[in-house]
C-alpha cells in the first residue's frame, strides 16, 4: 500500500524529482500513481507558477515569489 501523502506533498515530490532529472516512469512507480494524476500534478504546478525546493526534509513551496506552503 502506498504511503499517504497530501496533494501538495505529491506535487512537491514530483517536481523536485523531475528537477533532479529522475525519469517520469520511476517517479510514477515510486509514488504509485496513474499517468493522469502525474500529468495533473505537473500541470497544476506549472499553471500556478509553483517553485518547490527541498530543504531539511521539507518542501518549501512559493507561488509568484511569495510563500505558499511548507510540507514534509
Task: Please place each PLM-identified region on the residue numbering.
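A short, conserved structural fragment
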Residues: 46-56
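Extended low-polarity, hydrophobic cluster-rich segments
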Residues: 11-12, 41, 68
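Short amphipathic alpha-helical interface segments
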Residues: 3-29
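Short, cationic-aromatic polyanion-contact patches
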Residues: 2-8, 56-72
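Proline- and acidic/polar-enriched loop/turn elements at helix boundaries
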Residues: 29, 40, 57-58
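Hydrophobic beta-strand residues in large extracellular and virion-surface proteins
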Residues: 14, 27, 51, 59-61
